[in-house]
Amino acid sequence: YTKANPDNMILGSGTSDLIRLTFETVKPERTLIVGPTYSEYERMAKLAGSEVDKFMLQNLDDFELDVDMLMKRLNDTIDMLIICNPNNPTSKLISKGNLNTILDACLDHDIFVMIDEAYIEFVKDTELITAISLTKKYDNLIVLRSVSKFFAAPGIRFGYAITANTDFLEAAGNSKTPWNVNTFACIAGIMFEDEHYINLTKSLIQTERNLIYSAMSTRKTIKVFKPDANFILIKLLKEGQTAADVFDYCIQKGLMIRDCTDYEGLGNQYVRFCFLKPEQNDTMVNTILEIV
């Protein structure tokens, strides 16, 4: 499925288990996190005793990564860099070319890089974007994957990580929890062979992503950030309107969206929602456009 060397793979009880294992193995004193992003990275870093720095993506840049600015933050005091690609909640992607540039700089500064690809399979041309192939070139890289999002199986609790760093693989093998992959997850691995589901899901998400962005991007009272993943981030521009207002309105209509107020670097003007079936997406878009 990933075309990776099985000897370079680590299995875990979801990506949270693998994030914890990565911190326990690397033992970084200082971690740099590209944000706004998934809060679990910071929580795990602090549990591991690491200091945390942030490199915050900016609204004015449409939350696109400014690689040159990030490069200026990379130095010998940083032990670990964390990137979510595509990023949650911005739904923005970093190209493989830019990842190469970042990884080269991290090698120079002896920085270990963790790239979380929980949403990568929703991206167009995943095989051209994924950093898995880069693990053959960079031994300071680990790539995390999950079945929770693309395969819609969060309850299975199954994730996997890929790295060519033999020291990491040995240390992680010695410290990971025994029997950390349950029987149901082992059986569910057959889902990676379901080409019909994989191709159908990719096609559906790509079509709906384009339709949703087109339908919402012309509204002047919101700023819609062009998505690369299976969800979209929106900034509310109507004076006095908050994410809580839109969230409550959607709840009353039987719809669930994400109020992004608690994301550091966003605030109470941002909401996010995931793409569903076409008819559900139509309802979601129309409902949000009723209030914004």
Q: Where are the predicted features?
A:
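Helix C-cap/helix->beta junction micro-motif
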Residues: 48, 108-109, 138, 219, ...
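PLP-dependent aminotransferase class I/II
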Residues: 140-225
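Active-site phosphate-binding strand-loop segment of PLP-dependent enzymes
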Residues: 59-123
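Phosphate-binding glycine-rich loop
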Residues: 1-30
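PLP-dependent enzyme catalytic core of the Aspartate aminotransferase-like
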Residues: 252-253, 262-292
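Conserved PLP-binding catalytic core of the aspartate aminotransferase-like
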Residues: 205-206, 219-253
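PLP-dependent aminotransferase-like
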Residues: 8, 24-83
